[in-house]
From Swiss-Prot:
Biological source species: Mycolicibacterium gilvum (strain PYR-GCK)
Keyword annotations of the record: Ribonucleoprotein, Ribosomal protein
UniProt family annotation: Belongs to the bacterial ribosomal protein bL12 family.
InterPro entries assigned: Ribosomal_bL12, Ribosomal_bL12_C, Ribosomal_bL12_C/ClpS-like, Ribosomal_bL12_oligo, Ribosomal_bL12_oligo_N_sf
Signal sequence residues: none
The keyword Ribonucleoprotein belongs to this UniProt entry's keyword annotation: yes
Highest taxon above the source species: Bacteria
Gene Ontology CC entries for this record: cytosolic large ribosomal subunit
PANTHER family according to UniProt: 39S RIBOSOMAL PROTEIN L12, LARGE RIBOSOMAL SUBUNIT PROTEIN BL12M
The protein's role, per its UniProt record: Forms part of the ribosomal stalk which helps the ribosome interact with GTP-bound translation factors. Is thus essential for accurate translation.
GO molecular function, one term: structural constituent of ribosome
Gene3D superfamilies: 3.30.1390.10, Single helix bin
Protein's UniProt name: Large ribosomal subunit protein bL12
Pfam families, per database record: Ribosomal_L12, Ribosomal_L12_N
Length: 130
């Protein structure tokens, strides 16, 4: 088989759909026993390990909203969960609230995270934003 240059490989990737690229990455990971996400996790852990935790917190742009507990007003919390998490039915929202602590929103901006936290706390839930 002829060796392809980097430019030729990039041109081939540009022709592929996202689904095809996703399948390619999965096969690549299995074939070479690697994960594409490993360098990102190491890079993210670097600043925190270096003692710059305050700087890392200021630069954070994605937040997770975690439901810690429903409190005494479970029905109100279920209603708010359905409002915040799109596409949830009543049963799914109830199961989510019953199985707390659970993440409700992941990788959202600060405004959305604070808004969700305020609504959930107003309904009686205990919530953390990370």
């Amino acid at each position: 088989m002829a060796k392809l240059s980097t430019d030729e490989l990039l041109d081939a990737f540009k022709e592929m759909t996202l689904l095809e690229l996703s399948e390619f990455v999965k096969q690549f990971e299995e074939t070479f026993d690697v994960t594409a996400a490993a360098p990102v996790a190491v890079a993210a852990a670097g600043p925190a390990a270096g003692g710059g935790a305050a700087e890392a917190a200021e630069e954070q742009s994605e937040f997770d909203v975690i439901l810690e507990g429903a409190g005494e007003k479970k029905i109100g919390v279920i209603k708010v969960v359905r409002e915040i998490v799109s596409g949830l039915g009543l049963k799914e929202a109830k199961d989510l609230v019953d199985s707390a602590p659970k993440p409700l929103l992941e990788k959202v901006n600060k405004e959305a995270a604070e808004d969700a936290k305020a609504k959930l706390e107003a309904a009686g839930a205990s919530v953390t934003v990370k």
